[in-house]
Structures are given as structure tokens and as C-alpha cells.
Amino acid sequence: MLKSFEKHLNAVSRKCCNFILGSSIPVLGFYCADTCIRNAFMEFMETRNSKSKYVEAFNTVQSNGATSAISTFHILKDEIIRRIPLLPIIQELRETRMSEVSAEEKILLWNQLKFMSLVRMFTTLAVLAQCNLLCKLALTVLGREAFKEQMVKEFDPSNTLRPSGSDEDPAVFTGIAYILLNNQLDELIQQVQLAVTLTFEEVSPTDIVDRKLIEALTTRVVEVFVNNYQFSIDGNKEVLLAEIPKQYIVTGNLLYRVLELEDFATQMDASIVMKNELIALNEHMLTYLPSIPQEGIRLAKILTTFTKISENVFEAPFQEQFFQSLQMVSDVNRYMAIVFSSFDDC
């Protein structure tokens, strides 16, 4: 009975179309499917109570995803600081005040500090965007399955899609998201370094720049990074799952969800969402720049401000403000809505 129902369910799911998330009221259109199963689903989705449950489930998943993203970033920020340290360069600069160091050496150290500050700042923005995207994707995939099971129970309370004691725990899945992000960090930093180098190699710290040029330069960094960086799940997935705490029994269910997460996280749509997130974060970051006079200002002074921003972004109030700017990116919710409505087990 259960297998037969799942067969019909997948037939209907593959023909799911015309998903609309407007005014927080999602509508699922099903067509060309088995009449009995189709009618059962339509009857379920047409009731006001069911729509309310759908919206509530979706909104809960997104809220939990945002919270998980902040927690994940809080852990990853220590890795960013460790892998892109600014303190040694700052200490060297302090020591030059007490020693006879040539002006050329001091300029070299200042330029190195400014370059590393840019790299750390844009790495931080990229990790913020990825945490928001991947954590929300992870919980949306799990939330969709939970809602799907709820629909099945509405259709036939005696059936269930998943065995009791499933290992699809949100804490485990967000832990996997952290492992994936941490494993990708070195590659991400390399691509940020490339983007910063290509963008700023033609300008000198002594150049006079205005706000429009600064905006163009930072936007260019985002574009170069997005064009060269591609999120992926490398290595043996069994090794990845082996890092899960032993109190959880890893089953095929969780492995399948990891494959789903990989599929959604590596699609072109996800890259577009990532780019729009970075654009929003970059725009928010620019609000911290000092007032620039009409005649312009030395780039070196702006880069000094970037150094301060790269330090402040790790503080709680600044983190919250950056994450709030991500919640304004409508493409994130649109993509999560598509994922949440993809009732397809194939």
C-alpha cells in the first residue's frame, strides 16, 4: 500500500508546476496525473487550513535557517581570523616606529595590510552569504520532507514515508553544512584573493578616488569572485558522514538528503542567489565608508577604513546588521520556495 502510494505521489510530484509565493500564500498546481491521487492532493491544498499549515511550515523553516546561519558563521569567523591574520602585519608596523626601517619597507607593509584587509572583508562577506544560503537550503530540504510526510498522514494516517528514529535531525544536517563550508574555505579565500588582485592591481593607494569609483571597484570584486568560484561537495560523502557524532545512526535517508543538498546548492540558480546576496552585503558594507568629498580622496584612506570594517564585522551588532541585509534579498526566499515545493523523490 505504502509503495503504491509513493509511486503515485512521485508521479504527481514530477508534474508539479506553477509554484507562486505571493503575499505569503503558496499555490501548487498539479496536472496530468492519476485522478484519484491528484484530487486528494488538490482537496488537501485547497483547504484554508492546509494553506495555513504550508505557509507556517515554510516560514518556520526559513526562520530556523536564518538562526542556524548566524550560529554557523559564529564558528567559521574564528577560522577566517586564523587563516587571514592581520595582527602580525599590524605588529610589524608598530615595531617600525621604534626601528630604522626604510620608507619603502613601511609602504610595503601598509600595502600588504590593506590587501589582506580587503581579502578578509570580502571573504567574510562570501562566508556570510554562503552560511545564509546553505543553512537555509539544508533546513528547507528537511522541512519539505517533514511537510510531505504530514500530507501523507492527512491522506492516510496509517502510512508514513519515513521510519521512526530517522537520523534526519536538523542539528546533524546544519552540522554537515558547517563541515562543507569549512572544507571549502581555503578555495574560497584563494578566489577572493584573485578577485581583489585583479580588481585593485591597476589602482595605487595614492590615487584620488570618489565614491562611484569605490562602489565600482568593490562591485567588480564581487563579480570576479562569483564568476570564478563554484561551491561543490568534494571527496567521499561517506567520509563526510563519518564526522557525524556517534549517537546518531547514519542511514540512507541522510545520505540521500546530502545528495539533494548538493544538487540544490550547485545549481545555476544558487549561484545567482549567492551573487545577489553578495551585492546586498557589499552595499551594506559601503554604508560604513566615511563621507567622501566631491573632489575625491586618497584610496589609501578608504583602504584604512576597510581594515576597520574587516575587524568590526565580527562583532555581534555588526553581524546582525549584515545578516539583516541578507533577509532583504528576495531571491533567497524565491529559491527556497522552489526547493520547498519540489516534492520529488527521484
Curated annotation (Swiss-Prot):
Pfam families: Peroxin-3. One of its GO terms (cellular component) is cytosol. GO terms for molecular function: protein-macromolecule adaptor activity; protein-membrane adaptor activity. One of its GO terms (biological process) is protein targeting to peroxisome. InterPro entries: Peroxin-3. This is Uncharacterized protein C29A4.14c. It comes from Schizosaccharomyces pombe (strain 972 / ATCC 24843).
